[in-house]
Amino acid sequence: MNEPKKTERPLLLGLLVKKFKAEGTPYIHFNWGRISLVLVVLIAFAWISMATLLFAYFKYVKDFDKVKFSNMMLLPIKYSEHKIEMGDRHIERGLQAVDNNNFNDGIRLLRLGLIRSPGNLEGLVKLAQLYEFGLKRKDIAIEMYIDGFGHDGINNKEFCIAALRTMLRNKMDTEIITIANEYLPKEFKKGDNPNLQTIAYAAATSSFYRGNFDKTEDYIHAFLLNESVDGIILSAKVSWDRGNKFSAIKKLESSLYKFPNSDELYSQLCYFYRKIDDFDSARRYAQLRNIKSPSNPNPIIDLIYLYNKYGIEDEVIKYSKQIIKNFSDNEIAIFQLANFAASTGKINIAQFCYELALEKDYDLGNFALTLVEAHISTKDYDGAVTFSEELLLENPKWLQDQWPIFSSLRALASYGLNRPDLGEIYLEEFLSEPRITSETLVAVADRFTANQMYQQAQKILDFAYTNDTNNQRILNNLIKVNLELGMTQDLGDQIKKLLQTRRPDKELLRDAYNRLGSDLFIFTKNRNAILMELGAILRD
C-alpha cells in the first residue's frame, strides 16, 4: 500500500519552506524572494524609525526647529549640508533674538550656529560686535574677524568693512598689514573686486599711523584710492605730516571740483586752516559746509568752536541760538551744544540746553552733567556743588546709572573748594565702579588735568593704565602728567613703550626730551639711552 505524498509546509511566515525529496526525506528551502522582501521592509522600517528619532533629536534636543524629515532620511550622504543648514537656522534665530533685545539667547544661538556654519559671515559680524561692544572682549572679536577672512570674507563687503574698522579702531596694524600681504594682488584695475580697495585703504591707514608714509602712498596709488574722498584725505594727511602743509591743502581744494558736496573735504579743510591759524579760510570753509548741508548741525557746531577760539562772543551766541532754533527737536545737536558749553564754561548755554532737555523729555542725565561741568570749567565750584546737591535732593532715576561720572564731578568741585577730604571720598567712589570704561577714565582725568589737579589725574590714569596697558591715549596722558609732577619711577619704561606705539605725539616727545635733560629727572631709568633715541627721532 503506497504512503500518501507529503506536501510542502511553510515555516516562519513563509520565509522557509519544509520540502521533501522523492524518497520522502525532508529538507529546508529558503524562500529568498520573500526573505529579501522582508529584509527590505525591515531595513526601510529601521531607516524610517532612525530618521524619525533623528528628526525628534534635532528638533527638540538640538533646537533646530526647521529640520526636514527628508534630510534625516538621507543624513549619511547629506550630513555636511544638514550641518550648515542647521547652523544657518541657529544664526537666523540668533539675529532675531538680538533684534528683540534678547541678548543672552541671541549670543547662545549665534555661537551654536557659527560652530556648524563658520562661513555665515552675517552671523560672525553680529557676534563679533556683541563681543566687542557688549561683552567688552575685543580680543575675541578681532580673532573672529581674522578667522572670517579664511571663509571667503574677502568677497563680502559688509564683513570686510566691519572687520577692518574694528582692527583699525583697536590699532591692530600688524594684523591688517598681514591680511593685505596675503590677499592684495600686485596689480589692480577698475572693475576688480572693490573689497580689495577696502583692504588697501585699511593697510594704507595703518602704515600712515606707523609713520610709513612711502608705503601709505604706494597703497594709495596702486589701488586707485586717490579717486575716493577717503583716499584723497589720507593722501593730504601724509603731505601735512611731512610738513608740506600747502600741498596738503591744495590736494583737498582741487578735489572739491570732483566732489563739490563732500562734507568730509570741507571739514578737513576747516581743520587744516584752523591748525595754521588762518581764521578767514577756516571760517569760509565752515560756512560753505553749512550752506552745502543746511540740515546738518555739525558745521554750525564747528563754527561755534571756531568763533569761541578767536574770542568772537557775538558769533558764538548767534550760532548757538541758530542751533536751538533750528534743531531743538534734534537731541544729538542740542547735546553737542551742551558739550561745547561744558568744555568752555558757557553756563548760560548749558543751563538753556538743560531746560530744553526737560521740556523735550530728552535723556536728562547727560544734560545735567554738562551743566555741572560747565560750572567747573569756569571754576565756579560753588555753583557746581549747589546744583549737584539739588540733583541729590530730586534723586532722579537717571542718577544711579550716571553715579560714577557724577561722583567724579563732585570730587573735582570738592578739590576746587579746597576740600580734599570730600574730594578723596568721591574720587574713590568713582574708581570703585566696576563698569567704568577706559574712555571714561581718560575723560575724567582730562578734567582734572585741565584744572591743574595733576596728582588726582595721575591717580586716575595710573589706575586706567593698570587695567588697559595697550591704550595709547592713556599712556600719552600718563606720561604728560608724570612729566608735570616730576615722577621718575616708571617714566623710563613708559616712554620706551610710547616709542613703540602708533605715531607717537611729536610734541610730547619733544617735551619729554627737554624735561629729561634737566636734573629733576636724573634718576629716570635708562635716561641717557632714551634721550639719545628721542633726539634721533626728533631730528628726522
What are these regions (language model features)?
Residues 58-60, 84-99, 110-114, 123-540:
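Alpha-solenoid helical repeat scaffolds
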Residues 1-2, 351:
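Primarily low-complexity, compositionally biased regions used by nucleic-acid-associated proteins
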Residues 103:
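Calcium-binding loop positions in Ca2+-binding modules
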Residues 2-83, 191-195, 205, 209-224, ...:
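Long, contiguous interaction/recruitment modules in multidomain scaffold/adaptor proteins
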